[in-house]
């Protein structure tokens, strides 16, 4: 047992970020209700961050917060806020203003070293050989995830690395959960409820029709989710 009553540890979580493009609370409320109806098991009562960077018109923050909360989503913070008055309103309600991560400055080139022995790098992988059923959640921390069987609707795959599904993919796949934007998702039969790479996601209705039910490869290109045939 620890000698101290609390312990602070760093951690990371996969959160949905709702980018607001409209200052009218009623419009946002209805749009969120429609999205939640498309993927209720994923979005119902989900914690979210509201990004307000695209808002150009003044916003009634109290009404906006109520409109979002009325859908069942739990607002845990706000990002992209540059307006001092809006910041004050948000902080008055007890919500934190979150600063989105910036790209790190490039590290200086390392000093020359003696040639290393010719060894192959080892990449960890979590392998699942059985079907992933509705309600199951599989997480592969700091590695890739490979599923050789079917993934049912309502099941969830999460990996800090890439995700490979060599069966029918009907559930949710979240690659790059720790923020790695170079990760990808590979499916032999893409029928997912949701696909996400480093927080950028599509719901099932956003997957291009020509790739639905087909072998596909998803990745981020210029910070946007893209899909192409899996050759």
Swiss-Prot record:
- This chain belongs to the protein called Septum site-determining protein MinC
Q: Which InterPro entries match?
A: CAP/MinC_C, MinC, MinC_C_sf, MinC_N, Septum_form_inhib_MinC_C
Per UniProt, the keywords (alphabetical) are: Cell cycle, Cell division, Septation
GO biological process terms on file: cell morphogenesis; division septum assembly; regulation of cell division; regulation of cell septum assembly
Q: Looking at the keywords, is Cell division present?
A: yes
Is Cell cycle among the key words of this record?
A: yes
Q: Which residues form a coiled coil?
A: none
Family recorded in the similarity comment: Belongs to the MinC family.
Complexes and interactors? Interacts with MinD and FtsZ.
What NCBIfam families does the database record attribute to this sequence? Answer: minC
Organism this protein belongs to: Shigella flexneri
Tell me the function of this protein. Cell division inhibitor that blocks the formation of polar Z ring septums. Rapidly oscillates between the poles of the cell to destabilize FtsZ filaments that have formed before they mature into polar Z rings. Prevents FtsZ polymerization.
Tell me which Pfam families the record gives: MinC_C, MinC_N
């Amino acid at each position: 047992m620890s000698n101290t009553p609390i312990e602070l540890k760093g951690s990371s979580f996969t959160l949905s970020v709702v980018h607001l493009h409209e200052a009218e609370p009623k419009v946002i409320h209805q749009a969120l209700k429609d999205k939640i109806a498309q993927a209720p098991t994923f979005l119902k009562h989900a914690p979210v961050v509201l990004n307000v960077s695209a808002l150009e018109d003044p916003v009634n923050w109290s009404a906006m917060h109520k409109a979002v909360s009325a859908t069942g989503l739990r607002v845990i913070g706000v990002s992209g806020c540059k307006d001092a008055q809006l910041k004050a309103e948000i902080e008055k309600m007890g919500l934190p203003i979150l600063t989105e991560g910036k790209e790190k400055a490039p590290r200086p080139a390392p000093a020359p070293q003696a040639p290393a022995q010719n060894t192959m790098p080892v990449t960890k992988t979590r392998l699942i050989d059985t079907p992933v059923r509705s309600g199951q959640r599989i997480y592969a921390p700091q590695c890739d995830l490979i599923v050789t069987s079917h993934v049912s609707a309502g099941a969830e795959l999460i990996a800090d690395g890439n995700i490979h599904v060599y069966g029918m993919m009907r559930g949710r796949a979240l690659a790059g959960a720790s923020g790695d934007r170079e990760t990808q998702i590979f499916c032999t039969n893409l029928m997912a409820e949701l696909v996400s790479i480093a927080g950028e996601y599509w719901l099932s209705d956003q997957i291009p029709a020509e790739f639905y039910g087909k072998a596909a490869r998803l990745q981020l290109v210029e910070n946007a989710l893209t899909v192409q045939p899996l050759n």
